[in-house]
Amino acid sequence: MLKKRIGISILDCNFGNLEEELGELKRNGVTNIHLDVMDTTFVKNITFGPCIINRILEHDFVFDVHMMVESPLDIIMQIDLERVSLVTIHSEVCDKAGVAEYLRKRNVLFGIALNPETQVDDAEMRSADFVLIMSVKPGFGGQKFQEECLAKVEEVRRYGKMVGIDGGIEMSNIGRITGADYAVVGSGYFRSGDRKKFLRDITDEFLCGSCSG
């Protein structure tokens, strides 16, 4: 994840036809998939557990896993990390050091996610490989992008960390986040009438916008 990338969150895909959705993502040129893991303990929603995660990981993508759970290590230990480049947990979660140690022993990057109301913390920034700035309240797709969260990008940059932004990203605001390394796009992609064109356009804007800026 050293190069700038768009990652597609499958939170808003058709889970009743997941295999076809993943196949279409591949045909449309998607390289990175963002897996949102929820179990109702940290956010009031539920997605999928280790069994389904491992089936998804059999597909040929670069995966990052966003753990919106209170006890991430319980799930992480059941995941096939050979196919995972990055795991992100939330700032509010306990035992971040234990999670970081477990991941790094397996050559997986350790990320910290910051909710819209969560401030940048010096100790956390120094411990993380990657910081995911949430531009919506975590737990549900389709929310409006909170532009005030962009101020955190420069704060995190001072620590020399890779920065991602997650939530409400569409063509109308992608140009505002070109200072990030990773943009997580979900509902904007899946609700598009022409998904392949949407992906091409939003990727071009994200990459070319950073070149001109």
Swiss-Prot record:
A divalent metal cation binds at H34, D36, H66, D166. The gene is RPE1. The keyword Transport does not apply. The active site is at D36, D166. Signal peptide: none annotated. One of its GO terms (biological process) is carbohydrate metabolic process. Pathway: Carbohydrate degradation; pentose phosphate pathway; D-xylulose 5-phosphate from D-ribulose 5-phosphate (non-oxidative stage): step 1/1. Belongs to the ribulose-phosphate 3-epimerase family. Substrate binds at S9, H66, G139, F140, G141, G142, D166, G167, G168, G186, S187. Its cofactor is Co(2+); Fe(2+); Mn(2+); Zn(2+). Binds 1 divalent metal cation per subunit. Active with Co(2+), Fe(2+), Mn(2+) and Zn(2+). Transmembrane segments: none annotated. Its EC number is 5.1.3.1. It holds the Pfam family Ribul_P_3_epim. It comes from Encephalitozoon cuniculi (strain GB-M1). One of its GO terms (molecular function) is D-ribulose-phosphate 3-epimerase activity. Catalyzes the reversible epimerization of D-ribulose 5-phosphate to D-xylulose 5-phosphate. It catalyses: D-ribulose 5-phosphate = D-xylulose 5-phosphate. PROSITE patterns: RIBUL_P_3_EPIMER_1 (PS01085), RIBUL_P_3_EPIMER_2 (PS01086). Keywords: Carbohydrate metabolism, Cobalt, Iron, Isomerase, Manganese, Metal-binding, Zinc. The keyword Transcription does not apply. This is Ribulose-phosphate 3-epimerase.
